Amino acid sequence: IAPFCHGPAGLLSAVDAAGASIFAGRRLTVFTDDEELTGGLGENSPWLVARTLRERGALGEDGPAWREHVVRDGNLISGQNPQSSEAVARTLIAALAA
């Protein structure tokens, strides 16, 4: 799975039978709270993706704002923002080729 930017929001609904996130303890990156707020949309959002994933146990790894940043944790490849899209694609292609 290779979400980037706000795509990891789709991971929030993936829970086990007890209701715990199946991504708890997994390393990933997502559009940061700082990027949400400096981008001008965060103050209008009822919740922030990065914060919510961390609250549910994901191990968020933030790179510099608005810069390419990719995290790979096994078969989970994630990119922080739109600037990371090409790097996510390259990492996914390399993972599939291995």
Q: What are these regions, as identified by a protein language model?
A:
Residues 1-98:
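Active-site-adjacent pocket-lining segments in enzyme domains
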